């Protein structure tokens, strides 16, 4: 289960309950949100989909505890192609 809680316009707390519970702090720059979604989905939904993407590739215990969303593409080059609308 993935739970996303908004802290402010760019920062979110994410709780993942799979193989134990982990907490993550994720920052989503406005321009990156626009680039990936063209404004068609919310930042919360983008983060949820991004964590689903990550969980298909690694356990929640391996996901960084705090990161900017663009960092995902440094580890998984296919991320932007896969997640974008």
Identify what each model region corresponds to:
Residues 24, 36-37, 50:
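A short, polar/proline- and glycine-enriched secondary-structure boundary/capping micro-motif
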Residues 40-85:
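Acidic, low-complexity intrinsically disordered segments
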Residues 31-40:
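Short, surface-exposed linear segments at secondary-structure transitions and domain or protein termini
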Residues 5-10, 35-36, 45-46:
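Short amphipathic alpha-helical surface micro-motifs
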Residues 20-23, 27, 73:
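Long, contiguous binding/interaction regions
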């Amino acid at each position: 289960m993935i739970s996303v809680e908004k802290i402010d316009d760019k920062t979110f707390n994410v709780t993942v309950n799979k193989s134990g519970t982990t907490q993550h702090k994720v920052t989503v720059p406005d321009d990156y949100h626009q680039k990936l979604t063209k404004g068609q989905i919310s930042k919360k939904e983008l983060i949820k989909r991004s964590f689903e993407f990550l969980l298909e590739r690694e356990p929640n215990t391996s996901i960084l505890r705090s990161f900017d969303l663009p960092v995902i593409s440094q580890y998984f080059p296919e991320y932007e192609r896969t997640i974008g609308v």
